[in-house]
Amino acid sequence: MTLAVIGLFTLFTSIIAITPAREFVSLAEREDALLRELFQGYQRWVRPVQHANHSVKVRFGLKISQLVDVDEKNQLMTTNVWLWQEWLDYKLRWNPENYGGITSIRVPSESIWLPDIVLYENADGRFEGSLMTKAIVRYNGMITWTPPASYKSACTMDVTFFPFDRQNCSMKFGSWTYDGNMVKLVLINQQVDRSDFFDNGEWEILSATGVKGSRQDSHLSYPYITYSFILKRLPLFYTLFLIIPCLGLSFLTVLVFYLPSDEGEKVSLSTSVLVSLTVFLLVIEEIIPSSSKVIPLIGEYLLFIMIFVTLSIIVTIFVINVHHRSSATYHPMSPWVRSLFLQRLPHLLCMRGNTDRYHYPELEPHSPDLKPRNKKGPPGPEGEGQALINLLEQATNSVRYISRHIKKEHFIREVVQDWKFVAQVLDRIFLWTFLTVSVLGTILIFTPALKMFLRTPPPPSP
């Protein structure tokens, strides 16, 4: 009894193990027979049409998976896409009932007729650009081929508002040899499929639409499909590492006039800022394309600051010259200078005035100079009185000389202090002037770019 049960169990498991393999072999044999039947006498160089005046209708669509790079310097856009191509090949039809219910097969794309659709604006010499993957052939003759492709397409860059710019890059697809009478392109979907798109860290795709067009050549019409990609740069990186440092450098230029006028580091600070701006300008030159048509926004701003800093150096040298003026350097102060810079402007600039601190002293008194008498008087009380008078006259002359000398030194010191105060007033004037120009220049330069950056793109035309 035990042996009988073991035998039945072994027979049952053998049947289960053998049956799927037989069915698999049968399915493979049927698919092999189908392929032999379909491709017997099949010529992949011949268009799949029954009449010469018929055209092959190719449904075309684009799916983007990644925006790899946008090279502004070389004006290239690198993308990874899938090309959706679908057409009818009447020579590849069969009845599924005759082949075990097989409704579709996968065949190498090299063995069937393909529409030679290429990217016209290809920039790396590989116009086909796609991988020769297998195509899906259905029993009704409908062929679907979706090869992945990596393209480097030419794109004219407009860097006017860099780094707040938007670019319009296009990809034009069409048949290389077939005109519109042989191959008719049909746009599957106006919008590019972005369901599996991998975000780019620098660019954002605002819109990606396709439109059908045609070009005329020797009385023949060649259809094509153009996909336009509206790209917006994400400016955070350039704002943090380019624009904000430039704003800081311009602010340092303004602070030069807040330093004391006798500081020799004022010119050194302005010169260091000018060198830093030159380095930033060289960095931008490595990024943007070398074009004389437009000047990028950040380039305009850097040139503005460089002119700004150069003027500040010139003004600083003038202020230092004023600071070191005195009567000893043969720079007497004019009355209008004294009235303007020592009386009027300090009140307008909220500075403590330096007015009426001194008057021009009379270095030579109008009183007659008393000269000592050398006459010797007669001896006695009168002679002693005359000697005392002479001694007093000599002492008076000495005191008068010392007084004149002190007044002169005081006058020179006051003149020096007045010129220093004039230099302070000039510093305060240029501080507010340069601060106003810096703020207004920054606003005027960046406002159009910010308006364009924040503007919502128009909806695509149907």
Curated annotation (Swiss-Prot):
Lineage, uppermost ranks: Eukaryota, Metazoa, Chordata, Craniata, Vertebrata
Segments crossing the lipid bilayer: 235-259, 267-284, 301-322, 429-446
Segments on the Cytoplasmic face: 323-428
Domain of life of the native organism: Eukaryota
GO cellular component, one term: postsynaptic membrane
UniProt name for this protein: Neuronal acetylcholine receptor subunit non-alpha-2
Gene3D superfamilies: Neurotransmitter-gated ion-channel ligand-binding domain, Neurotransmitter-gated ion-channel transmembrane domain
Location of region: Disordered: 362-384
